[in-house]
Amino acid sequence: MNLPETRQQKNMLFDFYEALLTAKQREVFAMHYMEDNSLAEIAECMGITPQAVADMLKRVNGRLNHYDKLLGMTEKFNNQQALAAKINIALDELEQNPSQSGVKQIRELVNEVLSNGI
């Protein structure tokens, strides 16, 4: 079951893939999700109908999701964030109890980050 995307998730997709959208698609997306304009406000500004705005937003969201399925940038980003959190925890533990095994654990986590790349 797919849960509806939050505004934050949509904005993250936009950050990763906005260059793959047309200028008009970028403008409509930004006006709605970042500037919080209504469909009617966007329609008036762009000289199109509110239904055309809704259709374009639906297409843009579909494209962003499609690009993410193909390229997987959000998953890679989330994995990197999780690894960074693990490194911070390991560093905190190492500060409390310095040991060679702690250094080894951090080195392994850093190598994992480097091998996964983004």
Question: Each PLM stretch: what is its role?
Answer:
Residues 2-17:
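Short, Lys/Arg-enriched N-terminal segment that forms or immediately precedes the first helix
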Residues 23-34:
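Short amphipathic alpha helix immediately N-terminal
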Residues 29, 42-43, 53:
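Hydrophobic positions on the alpha-helical face of helix-turn-helix-like DNA-binding modules
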Residues 49-50:
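Helix-turn-helix DNA-binding motif, specifically the short coil turn and the N-cap/start of the second
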Residues 56-59:
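Residues within the DNA-recognition helix of helix-turn-helix
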Residues 61-68:
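C-terminal flanking helix
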Residues 71-99:
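Intrinsically disordered, low-complexity basic tails/linkers immediately adjacent to helix-turn-helix/homeobox/MYB/SANT
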